[in-house]
Amino acid sequence: MPGIEETIVDTRENVVVAIDRWLKDNKVDRLLAYNAAFDRNHLPELKSYTWCDIMRLAAYRQYNAKIPADVACYGTGRMKRGYGVEPILRMLGEDKHYEETHNAYFDALDELKIVQLLGHEIEVYDNAVIGR
């Protein structure tokens, strides 16, 4: 991450304060996360930011052109199943056998990759804001 040159090992409280400071210093006002409600609920210190749920775009036909025609969707366009990070990355990317490594760092990289592969402008994520 630009401005962070080394691994930070500290208490949760101090790390969250450092993240919040970095976000403010870099004029970040929104956070994108897959299943953002989970992260938002586990990071109450960051509730002042606008949280956008990447899943709200990745799992809907109107935002994800790579959803195959034979995938079952509700009338809203949302997939009925199979819209976790792993299946979405397999759908969008070239690695059809992708397997997640669950930790904060790799989860963030996976989520960034989904955002990049969807290719939407940041304003499109206004449709994915949670907790207004």
Question: Model-predicted segments: where are they?
Answer:
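Conserved non-catalytic scaffold segment of RNase H-like nuclease domains
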Residues: 1-49, 76-79, 85-92
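Acidic, Mg2+-coordinating catalytic module of metal-dependent nucleases/exonucleases
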Residues: 30-33, 42, 73-132
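Short alpha-helix plus adjacent loop in nuclease-associated cores
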Residues: 52-79
